[in-house]
UniProtKB/Swiss-Prot annotation:
Keywords: Hydrolase, Magnesium, Metal-binding, Nucleotide metabolism, Nucleotide-binding. The active site is at residue 196. GO terms for molecular function: dITP diphosphatase activity; ITP diphosphatase activity; metal ion binding; nucleotide binding; ribonucleoside triphosphate phosphatase activity; XTP diphosphatase activity. Binds 1 Mg(2+) ion per subunit. This is dITP/XTP pyrophosphatase. Pyrophosphatase that catalyzes the hydrolysis of nucleoside triphosphates to their monophosphate derivatives, with a high preference for the non-canonical purine nucleotides XTP (xanthosine triphosphate), dITP (deoxyinosine triphosphate) and ITP. Seems to function as a house-cleaning enzyme that removes non-canonical purine nucleotides from the nucleotide pool, thus preventing their incorporation into DNA/RNA and avoiding chromosomal lesions. It comes from Streptococcus pyogenes serotype M3 (strain ATCC BAA-595 / MGAS315).
Length: 328
């Protein structure tokens, strides 16, 4: 085993670990009962070998909210140090540990989950499939990268050509996301995730906002939208006055459940000219924070770590298992 120190940190979780211990989770950021429950789940998966040559995990918890984050952190350590391929898959409010198509362990939330939910034969199982309410392949690719890391198979509306287009008649991001998610869920009986995302430019009073995709008119394209945006800011020379934020609102809808809503923003500035070949939408003209790099210059994994959509998905996954397990 290496002496590598692993770390994971977000707004609600902070873990530090190494694989030279005896399968121990400690710290002031988590209850003892939670430690024991996760320790019992993982203890048999990571071999400690012996006291002279330990191979187990040793994790300190500084801040804790999500069992999914902690379990994923420890499994990632085990995989990297032992070349195993254990997958952490949320499913029906539980967390499954799967290796080589075999189920190793199941983490249950407090109160358990109903057998009807867990063994449902419909395709509502979030750990198996998620239907994204969009036909935009660029957006779907981002979601596929994000959810693929968590063991989900992603479909979009192109897989269901018979479904109608849902008019985005709302005046806020949440209204539009709810319209899409709840309408498609009602029509299909499936669990559906919709997002409404856009670019808010401070110098333009928050425009293009909910009209980001149609900013240049009814026949809008990414190139036309970027050209119009740069034209609107042509007389704004100070970069600090070209501040902007990418915003996303995610809504997950399912039959007989209150919808789950999550929001996130990605701050930056609007450049004076496009740059980069990756991404889509306004990525070529969006400067990421104070980095000087355009979003379209980032590789997919880099963008997913930083972007509004990546942040929103990670926030969503913190609360999703409890939401799914809760009976309406």
């Amino acid at each position: 085993m290496s002496e590598k120190i692993y770390e994971y940190k977000d707004e609600n979780n902070w873990f530090i670990g190494k694989m030279t211990g005896h399968n121990l989770i400690s710290g002031w950021g988590v209850k003892h009962t939670t430690i024991k429950k996760i320790d019992d789940l993982l203890d048999g998966i990571a071999a400690t070998l012996d006291w002279e040559n330990p191979k187990g995990y040793d994790v300190s918890v500084v801040r804790y909210q999500s069992p999914l984050s902690l379990i994923t952190f420890i499994i990632d350590m085990i995989n990297q140090e032992t070349q195993r391929e254990i997958k952490v898959t949320p499913h029906a409010g539980t967390i499954l540990l799967i290796e080589n198509a075999k189920l190793l362990a199941v983490y249950l939330p407090e109160g358990g989950v109903s057998t009807a939910t867990f063994f449902a034969t419909s395709e509502q199982g979030f750990g198996d499939i998620i239907l994204i309410a969009t036909r935009n392949e660029g957006k779907t690719k981002e979601f596929r990268n994000l959810f693929g890391q968590l063991g989900y198979r992603v479909e979009n509306l192109n897989d269901y050509p018979e479904l109608p287009e849902v008019a985005e008649t709302g005046t806020t991001f949440e209204e539009n996301a709810r319209l899409k998610a709840e309408t498609i869920s009602r029509l299909t009986g499936k669990m559906v995730l919709a997002d409404d995302s856009g670019l808010k430019v401070d110098a333009l009073g928050g425009l293009p906002g909910v009209w980001s995709a149609r900013f240049s008119g009814p026949d809008a394209t990414d190139a036309k939208n970027n050209t119009k945006l740069l034209h609107e800011l042509a007389m704004v020379f100070d970069q600090k006055k070209r501040s902007a934020q990418f915003h996303t609102t995610l809504v997950v809808a399912a039959p007989n459940k209150d919808s789950l809503v999550m929001e996130a923003e990605w701050p930056g500035y609007i450049a004076t000219q496009p740059k980069g070949e990756n991404g889509f939408g306004y990525d070529p003209v969006f400067i990421v924070g104070e980095t000087g790099r355009h979003a379209a210059e980032l590789e997919a994994d880099q963008k997913n770590q930083l972007s509004h959509r990546g942040q929103a998905v990670r926030k969503l996954m913190e609360v999703f298992p409890a939401w799914q397990a809760k009976q309406s």
